């Protein structure tokens, strides 16, 4: 086994000690309770499915984000603030490799766990369709953007409390403010600016698209696609900035 | 062969220049003391060697390799810090197993050798300073390192724990392990090191064998039973009082002989210690 893989095993173990997954996996499975609830109330309409994937309503998504938040701020962040990262960086691993290992453990594994559980759940329920698949893609893009914000604030602020408050405030402001803006644009039928802010809260557009698909003739779907792309690009940028910062950080 | 080589290493933190061109070598097989007052740049230098602080300029080589470019060198170099830098909720056993998972080594043997069996389930946060240092040293040796760099390893230890640490260092050095040890507990460091590097204000002020550092100036320290009489016997020579000691620039045998002829008992006679050399090379002598 290569040195990097050996270090990765240690990094992974630190984040997923028992009972982390024993708590999170059942919570993610049980957190899908809103999917059948909305589908029944919505008479199995697509918008019922879309609504059930809005963060906060969907407990599984909230659990995935909570796990990532804990990993980033209270494991990786804490290791940096307290100097424990010294022990890992005096192992035979470069800073870039260590950062990627931490990122995969902190962020990618919770996302993949969520996606795996959702895919199996939706498939078994017979509702793994373009709507639910699209919602998984929308969530994944937003998740990568949000965790990118959390990573950057964690490495810049070097304080767990300040990182939690700042990232939650920033993300909430973007999500709520963007959602209100999108709602205003949609109901006033002013769709020219919608693609520009679609990344802030794609769920408003997704709900509108599934409620009244014929009214907008695909304009909302285009804005939605653009929003997902912007989220992915911004997320990648935030990770690159954090990595560059970490590479030259004095520890 | 050179185990550590630093050439003109410079590092600033904002406006503060911590290292102003640090250069020194550590010979393979030696136990080298890295000595300087607080804020002299010892920890920054060690962090540079550990790859934790990137220097602004200069060259760093551990066992002939650049720790920033060739991270595999960490398989042969161990670092021991003042406090154990590992997640404090991990137990001693988890810590040792993690280290063994990366570097290899026999955890059972380390547990036996360092007498850690009864402490295995303790969290790292629950360990006393002495025990934490013992655990850290046990972990550092799992990889069978060629070089151990220790930053103030005795800083928080009581005298018995310090003695134990230094005995282990001597034993490991006999087996061929090279050491660079930063410390401010100089009287005890003197017992274990054979070379010394003095650093002051971000610059190396002396580098060489311990004997050479101590011999410079040829001062000797005498503890006598009658200070006034001794002062009159040694009058006309370069003599001064330093605490209970008389410090005199003279041949030791000649001084003892003339004092004893005058009926002054010499209780202790010694050359300058690392403490005196420390004052001299770090501009703290006043």
Where are these regions (language model features)?
Chain B
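Short alpha-helical
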Residues: 68, 87, 105, 187, ...
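ABC transporter nucleotide-binding domain
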Residues: 166-249
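ABC transporter nucleotide-binding domains
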Residues: 11-181, 186-187, 191-192
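Structural motif detector for alpha-helix initiation sites
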Residues: 28, 92, 210, 271-274
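Alpha-helix C-terminal capping segments
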Residues: 67-68, 74, 96-104, 109-116, ...
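Short, charged/small-residue-rich alpha-helical element at the C-terminal edge
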Residues: 218-286
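Extreme N-terminal starter segment of soluble prokaryotic enzymes
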Residues: 2-3
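Conserved catalytic Walker-motif region of ABC-type ATPase nucleotide-binding domains
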Residues: 6-9
